[in-house]
């Protein structure tokens, strides 16, 4: 087994059913890595250099569950990661020590019907990192199947950690059937909404209108894509009233009458019932509302609006077969996600990172946790590390 010597203690970021958040020792230990213990066939050991905090990480911490996925014990968070290969099992031939990789955070069975038909995101036996009871990637070192470690070449680890949320939006673009010139609504200007904006712009959608309740996030969207049109959602307005404002914004302030252009597609990135309903009332006859955001178990939606307007309501679950494309898009400059990382912290300061990510007043878009203060300083200075 090929391996590098490690000297730092492996620590991880944990939560539990009591909603505590703390840093503690994790596995594999530095001693095990140096002794070549614990690495299974087909696996590599990775030093995790950057990990983004996802809204689901904050939700597992604060709420203890997402639907049926429940935190039942001490649980390591994090699933948006990139790092460097430290050790390689003898049967792994396509990776070597020192390779820079992004970690696709799933382990599938390769035996069920979804796996055998190429839709492995539906694997009935999947172990998805950071989804209870499977520990996540917010650790200094982690063992992971080599087949789910994608080479990123000279891409920064910061960009490598953005490949996971980019994969979410690429799955949405593909499944939704977005085409060149399609008028588009994006509801929610959080990280997924903003990455959807960049992805949809690259895919040729126009015009695009994006909504949010936060004026600052809409301004951020405008700084990313100056031609995007924005609509600030006012709390208390009905879905129909919001739809009128959205259509007016899509038409550059020229009104929302019967002849106004309506979105052919809405990418719903909030999972909030009122936002889903606003999207349903906004799209054209024969349009589609594609739900990316994760919401509550049950919602009330305007069924007859969907029925009489032949509006399709469609969803996605994670992603599959998207990572190679995501890597190419970033490497070739088609999509630039670098501006979305607004805050960076070392692993030792991960608790502060979570406080920043969970507080709307900080203005954070994407918070990343890096393996060392040196990495934080390099990334903040715009240096590739």
Curated annotation (Swiss-Prot):
Species assigned in the record: Penicillium rubens (strain ATCC 28089 / DSM 1075 / NRRL 1951 / Wisconsin 54-1255)
User: Keywords assigned by UniProt?
Assistant: Arabinose catabolism, Carbohydrate metabolism, Metal-binding, NAD, Nucleotide-binding, Oxidoreductase, Zinc
Q: In which pathway does it act?
A: Carbohydrate degradation; L-arabinose degradation via L-arabinitol; D-xylulose 5-phosphate from L-arabinose (fungal route): step 2/5
Alphabetized SUPFAM superfamilies for the sequence: GroES-like, NAD(P)-binding Rossmann-fold domains
Q: Which Gene3D superfamilies match?
A: Medium-chain alcohol dehydrogenases, catalytic domain, NAD(P)-binding Rossmann-like Domain
| Alphabetical list of PROSITE patterns matching this protein | ADH_ZINC
Annotated GO biological processes are: L-arabinose catabolic process to xylulose 5-phosphate; sorbitol catabolic process
Give the enzyme's EC designation: 1.1.1.12
Give an example GO molecular function: L-arabinitol 4-dehydrogenase activity
> Could you tell me what this protein is called?
L-arabinitol 4-dehydrogenase
To which protein family does this belong?
Belongs to the zinc-containing alcohol dehydrogenase family.
Characterize activity with respect to temperature.
Answer: Optimum temperature is 40-50 degrees Celsius.
- This protein's gene is called lad1
Which residues of this UniProt protein bind Zn(2+) 2?
109, 112, 115, 123
Where do the annotations place NAD(+) binding? 191-192, 212, 217, 292, 316-318
């Amino acid at each position: 087994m090929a391996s590098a010597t490690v000297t730092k203690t492996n620590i991880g970021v944990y939560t539990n059913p009591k909603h505590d958040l703390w840093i503690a020792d994790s596995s594999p230990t530095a001693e095990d890595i140096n002794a070549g213990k614990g690495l299974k066939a087909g696996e590599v050991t990775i030093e995790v250099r950057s990990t983004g905090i996802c809204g689901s990480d904050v939700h597992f911490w604060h709420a203890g569950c997402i639907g049926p996925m429940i935190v039942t014990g001490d649980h390591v968070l994090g699933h948006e990661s990139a790092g460097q290969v430290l050790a390689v099992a003898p049967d792994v031939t396509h990776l070597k020590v020192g390779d820079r990789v992004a970690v696709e955070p799933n382990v599938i069975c390769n035996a069920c019907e979804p796996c055998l038909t190429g839709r492995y995101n539906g694997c009935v036996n999947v172990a998805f990192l950071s989804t209870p009871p499977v520990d996540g990637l917010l650790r200094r070192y982690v063992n992971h199947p080599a087949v789910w470690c994608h080479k990123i070449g000279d891409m920064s680890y910061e960009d490598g950690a953005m490949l996971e949320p980019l994969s979410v939006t690429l799955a949405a673009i593909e499944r939704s059937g977005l085409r060149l010139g399609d008028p588009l609504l994006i509801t929610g200007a959080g990280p997924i909404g903003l990455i959807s904006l960049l992805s949809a712009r690259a895919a040729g959608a126009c015009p695009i209108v994006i909504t949010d309740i936060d004026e600052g996030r809409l301004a951020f969207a405008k700084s990313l894509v100056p031609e995007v049109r924005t609509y600030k959602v006012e709390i208390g307005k009905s879905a129909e009233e919001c739809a009128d404002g959205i259509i007016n914004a899509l038409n550059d302030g020229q009104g929302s009458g019967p002849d106004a252009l309506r979105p052919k597609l809405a990418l719903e990135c909030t999972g909030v019932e009122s936002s889903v309903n606003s999207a349903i009332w906004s799209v054209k006859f024969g349009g589609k509302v594609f739900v990316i955001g994760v919401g509550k178990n049950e919602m009330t939606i305007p069924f007859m609006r969907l029925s009489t307007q032949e509006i399709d309501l469609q969803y996605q679950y994670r992603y599959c077969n998207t990572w190679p494309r995501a890597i190419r898009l970033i490497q070739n400059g088609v999509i630039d996600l670098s501006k979305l990382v607004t805050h960076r912290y070392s692993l030792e300061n991960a608790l502060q990172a979570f406080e920043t990510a969970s507080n709307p007043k900080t203005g954070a878009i994407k918070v990343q946790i890096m393996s060392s203060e040196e990495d934080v300083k390099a990334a903040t200075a715009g240096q590739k590390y």
